[in-house]
Structures are given as C-alpha cells and as structure tokens.
UniProtKB/Swiss-Prot annotation:
Homodimer which binds Holliday junction (HJ) DNA. The HJ becomes 2-fold symmetrical on binding to RuvC with unstacked arms; it has a different conformation from HJ DNA in complex with RuvA. In the full resolvosome a probable DNA-RuvA(4)-RuvB(12)-RuvC(2) complex forms which resolves the HJ. Its cofactor is Mg(2+). Mg(2+) 1 binds at residues 16, 148. The gene is ruvC. Binds 2 Mg(2+) ion per subunit. This is Crossover junction endodeoxyribonuclease RuvC. GO terms for cellular component: cytoplasm; Holliday junction resolvase complex. It comes from the Bacteria. The lineage of its organism: Bacteria, Pseudomonadati, Pseudomonadota, Alphaproteobacteria, Hyphomicrobiales. Belongs to the RuvC family.
Length: 175
C-alpha cells in the first residue's frame, strides 16, 4: 500500500492592480489550509508622470517578490467602465502587475472580480465590507490597512482554490 501524497505549502501572491494604489497579499496554501504571510500596497506619487508611477509600482512589487518569494501569482481581471481613459490607465497598471512576477519566472493567473467574490463570500455580488469580514474568518491574523490589500488577499485565496485549473490553462496556452 502506498503512502498518501505529501502536500507541500505553496506561497501565493495576489495583486489588485491600480494606478493610485496597487494592493498585494501573500498567503500560503496547503490543501485547504490557508496561512496569512503579509499584505500591503504600493502607492506611487500621483504628481509624477504616468511612466514614473508605473515604474514605482514595478519597483514596489519587485520588493514584495524578493522579500516573500512566492511560487505563484494571481491578478484581478480588469473590468471596462464608461471612462475609456481610466480603463486604459488601469490596464497599464495591470500590465505591470502581471509583468513583475513574470520577470522572475512566476506563472500569473487571472480571475474575474465576480469569481473572486463568489470564492471568498459565496456570492458574485458582494461589497468590500463583506470581503473584509470574510477575510477575518479565513485569515484571522490578517489586518489589511487598505481595501486594495484586502482585495489582493481575496485574489490570492481565489487562486488557492482554483489553482489547479488555472495552471492547466496557463500551460495549455504556453504550449
């Protein structure tokens, strides 16, 4: 009789991209157990030109990647709003959020906002207060100081629950 497989903890970085504030959250997942590792946000100087703000986001995420050394990363997909200019700028911040982990060889999964809410809360249309309340249950040691950091933790939790399918899709696209 063979022994059951040993589950190794996997460190996951969740990123909630934004031009004013990019949230990040790091958890470890082992089976169905989640452990809070860290969270915060990168807040570039809004008075800087766009390219400099994007560079600050990249530098901030690079520091997080170096400090916490995640094995996988996940980013929230962008929704399109009425302001096309704002959507394009958010897309640029999202590009940086996907590029930073990719530059160090980390696969990046993407999740729709409704799937993140459904995974964490159980319903696809939840507000930020509901997400923060559920984070206290799922990650009792987490005390995110910003809604963006809380959202990033929710993204990491979503990846922990859906990572098998997301990684298979990533490998299929890369093949």
């Amino acid at each position: 009789m063979s022994a059951p497989p040993i589950r190794q903890p996997i460190r996951i970085l969740g990123i909630d991209p934004g031009l004013r504030r990019t949230g990040w959250g790091v958890i470890e997942s082992c089976g169905n157990r989640l452990v809070f590792i860290g969270c915060g946000s990168v807040e570039p100087d809004n008075d800087l030109p766009l390219a400099s703000r994007l560079l600050e986001i990249h530098h901030g995420l690079a520091k997080v990647l170096a400090e916490f050394v995640p094995a996988e990363a996940a980013v929230e997909q962008t929704f399109v709003n009425k302001d096309a200019g704002a959507t394009l700028k958010l897309g640029q911040a999202r590009g940086i959020a996907m590029l930073a982990p990719a530059l160090v060889g980390i696969a990046v999964a993407e999740y729709a906002p409704n799937l993140i809410k459904k995974t964490v809360i159980g319903a696809g249309h939840a507000d930020k207060a509901q997400i923060q309340m559920m984070l206290k249950i799922l990650l009792p040691k987490a005390e995110p100081k910003t809604a963006d950091a809380a959202d990033a933790l929710a993204i990491a939790i979503t990846h922990a629950h859906h990572r098998g399918g997301a990684l298979l899709r990533l490998k299929a696209v890369q093949a």
